[in-house]
């Protein structure tokens, strides 16, 4: 009987432990670990397991708290204006632990998600420094690494690991280093590297010529001098990048059919046509100017020409707000208006759309009007 009573007591205690608290209260909150904010409980089948087991970079949580609470004082002088202009904030953890060889630190990140079509507003390297017996100058080397590819050395800078009292984090401005990598990466050779001194003070990087690249790759290739090595965990280092989408001059990256036709030797110029047959040229001048010069015809039936307009997607309205923490909405854009006939390069048409518009120019009933389709898509960074 005593053993049976113990079993029943244990079962009751287990049920009491597993019983939801205040489950009937509307708008129950699930607190996020490491913060005093709460999020609405999910209405899906996963329930409270939505955020279970998830780990968030502390810097991103702090930034999210700043956005929600509107506490601009927590932002640095650089972050405040940049945050207002940025479309996305990306965070990168180290691919491997920081390798410390003597006074040289080697940091590796996979920055493949940073596109050259994005305008880089700010890049901050945040390091939670370990305890040192005595401060000493160190050289921090930054690498771009991706599985199956050779590590790309991006640059280095010198600093002192000492931090201000009451803070264990030190922030470095790597904006110029990443801008060089994004915009001049094709000219980057094995003999060069970028040395950034006092970068957090706004100094410009200097390209230094090196004949031997092994000197800057010691941290990743091995310790040849038997210098004492150490490391600290990946979560102590995070790279935070603020970006903004920018329009590109050519979405396709290669000459379109219109450019190919214009540069063809079989296409006669307007002056050649006029010399060959002046009468026929005058009779068909309007049509030829439309095709050869790619002029935009006037608006038909008072409809505005096709253009990109805003289309705000609100996750709260589509019932996804309880799962998506940030952003709560974004601009997906859409096309509005009538396409001209024929299309010209201003609207960046595909070859199929251009041919289709030419067919419609001569036979209105044979094909339907061209329609806009996305020509460029980019991932949206979200905190779930």
Curated annotation (Swiss-Prot):
Cellular component GO terms held in the UniProt record: extracellular space
* Prodomain residues: 19-283
Which keywords annotate this record? Cleavage on pair of basic residues, Developmental protein, Disulfide bond, Glycoprotein, Growth factor, Secreted, Signal
- This protein's source sits in the domain of life called Eukaryota
Disulfide bonding pattern of the chain: 306-372
Annotated localization: Secreted
One of its GO biological process terms is: gastrulation with mouth forming second
Sites of glycosylation? 71, 173, 344
User: Span of the secretion signal?
Assistant: 1-18
The induction text for this entry reads: By dorsal-mesoderm inducing signals including activin, vegt and other nodal-related proteins. Beta-catenin potentiates the response to activin and vegt. Not induced by wnt8 alone, but wnt8 potentiates the response to activin.
List the InterPro entries hit by this protein, alphabetically: Cystine-knot_cytokine, TGF-b_C, TGF-b_propeptide, TGF-beta-rel, TGFb_CS
Task: List the GO molecular function terms.
Answer: cytokine activity; growth factor activity; morphogen activity
- State what this protein does: Cooperation and regulatory loops of multiple nodals are essential for mesendoderm patterning in early embryos. Essential for mesoderm formation and axial patterning during embryonic development. Activates the activin-like signaling pathway to induce dorsal and ventral mesoderm in animal cap ectoderm. In addition, also dorsalizes ventral marginal zone (VMZ) tissues during gastrulation. Induces muscle actin. Appears to act as both a short-range and long-range morphogen. The unprocessed protein inhibits bmp- and wnt-signaling.
What PANTHER family does the database record attribute to this sequence?
NODAL HOMOLOG (PTHR11848:SF159), TGF-BETA FAMILY (PTHR11848)
- How is the subunit organization of this protein annotated in UniProt? Homodimer; disulfide-linked. Forms heterodimers with the TGF-beta family member derriere. Interacts with tsku; enhances nodal2 activity.
Could you say which protein family the record assigns here? Belongs to the TGF-beta family.
What is recorded about the protein's domains? The pro-region is necessary but not sufficient for wnt-inhibitory activity. The central region is required for muscle induction activity.
Q: What is this protein called?
A: Nodal homolog 2-B
Gene name tied to this protein: nodal2-b
């Amino acid at each position: 009987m005593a053993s049976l009573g113990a079993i029943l007591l244990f079962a009751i205690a287990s049920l009491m432990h597993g019983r939801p608290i205040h489950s009937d209260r509307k708008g129950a909150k699930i607190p996020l670990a490491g913060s005093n904010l709460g999020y609405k409980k999910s209405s899906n089948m996963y329930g409270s397991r939505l955020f279970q087991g998830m780990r968030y970079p502390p810097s991103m949580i702090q930034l999210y708290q700043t956005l929600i609470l509107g506490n601009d004082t927590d932002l640095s002088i650089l972050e405040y204006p940049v945050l207002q202009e940025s479309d996305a904030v990306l965070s990168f953890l180290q691919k491997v632990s920081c390798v410390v060889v003597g006074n040289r630190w080697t940091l590796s990140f996979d920055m493949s998600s940073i596109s050259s079509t994005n305008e880089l507003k700010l890049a901050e390297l945040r390091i939670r420094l370990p305890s040192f017996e005595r401060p000493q100058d160190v050289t921090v080397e930054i690498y771009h690494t991706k599985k199956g590819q050779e590590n790309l050395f991006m640059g280095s800078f010198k600093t002192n690991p000492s931090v201000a009292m009451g803070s264990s984090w030190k922030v470095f401005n790597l904006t110029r280093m990443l801008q060089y990598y994004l915009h001049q990466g094709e000219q980057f050779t094995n003999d060069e590297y970028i040395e950034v001194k006092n970068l957090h003070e706004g100094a410009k990087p200097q390209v230094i010529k090196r004949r031997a690249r092994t000197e800057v790759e010691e941290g990743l290739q091995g310790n040849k001098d038997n210098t004492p090595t150490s490391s600290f965990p990946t979560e102590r280092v995070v790279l935070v990048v603020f970006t903004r989408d920018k329009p590109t001059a050519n979405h396709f990256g290669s000459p379109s059919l219109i450019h190919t036709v214009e540069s063809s030797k079989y296409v006669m110029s307007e002056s050649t046509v006029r010399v060959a047959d002046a009468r026929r040229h005058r009779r068909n001048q309007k049509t030829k100017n439309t095709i050869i010069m790619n002029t935009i015809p006037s608006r038909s039936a008072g409809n505005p020409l096709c253009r990109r307009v805003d289309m705000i997607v609100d996750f709260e309205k589509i019932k996804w707000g309880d799962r998506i923490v940030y952003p709560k909405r974004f601009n997906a854009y859409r096309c509005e208006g009538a396409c001209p006939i024929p299309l010209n390069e201003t609207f960046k048409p595909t070859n199929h759309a251009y041919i289709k518009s030419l067919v419609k120019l001569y036979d209105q009933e044979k094909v339907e009007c061209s329609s806009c389709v996305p020509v460029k898509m980019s991932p949206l960074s979200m905190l779930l």
